Amino acid sequence: MMHFTSRTPAVSAVIATNGKRPELLRVAVRSILEQSYRGFVEVVVVFDRVEPDHLEDIEVGENRALKIVSNTRSGGLAGGRNSGIIASSGEMIGFCDDDDYWMPSKLTQQVALWRENPEATAISSGITVRSGGQDIVRLAPERATFADFLRSRITEIHPSAMLYSREDLLGVDGQPARIGLVDEELPAAYGEDYDLLLRATRHGDVLSVPEPLILVLWDRPSFFSGKWQSMVDGLSYILRKFPEFEQDPKGLARIAGQIAYAQASLGNNKEARAYARSALRRDPKQLRAWAAYVVSTGIIKPATLLDLVQKTGRGL
């Protein structure tokens, strides 16, 4: 729940980066600083295990701030985001990947929606995915519950679109936070955004502006290509952490199918087929499980299927 102290509460946007995309990083930072939102906007850029780029060529306008910090916690995305959250000052906190872009009215529309629905646990929006030379609009559901997230990751609700309440992430007046920080125990931070959404929706729903308010660039090598073990470890961790998946056979089948595909991509064909069977017992239409069987035969390479899926603006 968001407790509004003004009509235009201060917003902090955290960008965690490894510094390898300096030009895209600048585009992301400027897109946040140039928001039409009338309230205070702060961008916190967190450099992870690299020398910080102080972005001195970026103009910072009135009622805007740019803060450059280093990741002082565990290495990787989760620790980077947490370092940024702790260093931030806004009543609302959002994230932006270092190669994504916020549309000018993002904060204005999201804060207005939250003011109308203060009981919401977080606010999101639709996205535009740029992939294969085309832009694909993916609209998020106007309301998403804990049960919805057990059934589906709902990839239209992207981490770069999210806004959370500061007190929900950090607590207030010595009281523990309802949601808490990003989980740094997740192996390779795989699924850290999904874990955060599951924890958040235990306390209330995520509402989304029914417009694409961020641009997500997928015209680059897949983050998951070659990182299949992280996928196996991360998803297995999430299943252990959220026993509620046992209450939703299709949701459990979805994750079992993802693990099956990752195991097949690693060449662990016995494990892949075991997870695929488990998934198909719960949901015979689980395509990831069928895909795992195909990959386990060696007929098609895992990266080939993944690239085909990503060209539709969807993830595995």
Indicate residue ranges for each PLM-predicted region.
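N-proximal low-complexity "stem/linker" segments adjacent to membrane-targeting elements
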Residues: 1-31
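Conserved nucleotide-sugar donor-binding catalytic segment
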Residues: 14, 143-229
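Short, acidic, metal-binding catalytic loop of nucleotide-sugar glycosyltransferases
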Residues: 30-40
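A conserved acidic beta->alpha catalytic loop
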Residues: 31, 47-57, 73, 97
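Flexible acidic/His/Gly-enriched loops in nucleotide-sugar-dependent glycosyltransferase catalytic domains
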Residues: 63-64, 79, 107-179
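Glycine-rich, basic loop-to-helix element that forms the pyrophosphate-binding segment
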Residues: 71-88
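Short aromatic/hydrophobic "clamp" motif used to bind/position activated sugar donors
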Residues: 93
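Catalytic core of nucleotide-sugar-dependent glycosyltransferases
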Residues: 212, 216-219, 224-250, 269-282
